[in-house]
Amino acid sequence: MNELPLHLLNMRSLTRDHIEKLIQRANYFLTQGMEKNSVFETLKGHVVANLFFEPSTRTRNSFEIAAKRLGAMVLNPNLKISAISKGETLFDTIKTLEAMGVYFFIVRHSENETPEQIAKQLSSGVVINAGDGNHQHPSQALIDLMTIKQHKPHWNKLCVTIIGDIRHSRVANSLMDGLVTMGVPEIRLVGPSSLLPDKVGNDSIKKFTELKPSLLNSDVIVTLRLQKERHDNSVDIDAFRGSFRLTPEKLYSAKPDAIVMHPGPVNREVEINSDVADNQQSVILQQVRNGVAMRMAVLELFLLRDFRFF
């Protein structure tokens, strides 16, 4: 197994073995921890700082619950009234928090590669990228891979269709990287051409501009919201809704046992119909539940740095 990176900044830094072990450990935390309301002491005495420079409900709260279930102290600085608002640089703030004893820095930022820049400033702490611009969101990809494997355990037989604003989605970037690492043979990207990436970088990834053909024989369908905060208002939402909203009728084109996923937040009746979001094929809430368990596994691994402790 290749050496674990010092920080979790992107999915390409993880090997298939790393991902499989993290899924295995997260499933343990799901069944032996969350379902039994257990609290572990792996992170006892350690401080975790949630540094979210963009709004978040699922990711921030999920990391906080994960850290507390591992016994950590959690710091949620109000960044609007921090020294940053008085002119202190972000990197001086990071060094100050490290001097106070913060070990884990969970970072979400609107600018690409900010977590990487923060990691370069640390003496001994760990940075977990909780989403940077339209670049990467590795913990969400790990959650999605965990959820997929719970329903579809054979990576080499899967067809995964990702629908929506892929060009601006850090979730899509990380998930594509993870699916390629796991050996998924067919990954389909679907949306208007303006919302698809110019290059895909792997032969297993194909682009579609029509929804129904992209759903044929799909095992996994991932819907994504429009990232309106990352581009201008040139996207015609009504046109997008008419062509790319996942409805029960369109879902019939996929395999009967296909699962439907969404990383959230969900914009109902834009990228996904409520009847699909709430039906038996939807695993959206399972993704949320898996989020705490996977983030527990991530925090534990990047502290212990040894799979033998798993």
UniProtKB/Swiss-Prot annotation:
It comes from Coxiella burnetii (strain Dugway 5J108-111). Catalyzes the condensation of carbamoyl phosphate and aspartate to form carbamoyl aspartate and inorganic phosphate, the committed step in the de novo pyrimidine nucleotide biosynthesis pathway. Pathway: Pyrimidine metabolism; UMP biosynthesis via de novo pathway; (S)-dihydroorotate from bicarbonate: step 2/3. Carbamoyl phosphate binds at residues 58-59, 108, 137, 140, 264-265. Pfam families: OTCace (PF00185), OTCace_N (PF02729). This is Aspartate carbamoyltransferase catalytic subunit. One of its GO terms (biological process) is amino acid metabolic process. NCBIfam families: asp_carb_tr, PRK00856.1, PRK13814.1. The keyword Transferase applies. L-aspartate binds at residues 86, 170, 225. InterPro entries: Asp/Orn_carbamoyltranf_P-bd (IPR006132), Asp/Orn_carbamoylTrfase (IPR006130), Asp/Orn_carbamoylTrfase_sf (IPR036901), Asp_carbamoyltransf (IPR002082), Asp_carbamoyltransf_Asp/Orn-bd (IPR006131). Heterododecamer (2C3:3R2) of six catalytic PyrB chains organized as two trimers (C3), and six regulatory PyrI chains organized as three dimers (R2). GO terms for cellular component: cytosol. Its EC number is 2.1.3.2. One of its GO terms (molecular function) is amino acid binding. Belongs to the aspartate/ornithine carbamoyltransferase superfamily. ATCase family. Keywords: Pyrimidine biosynthesis, Transferase. It catalyses: carbamoyl phosphate + L-aspartate = N-carbamoyl-L-aspartate + phosphate + H(+).
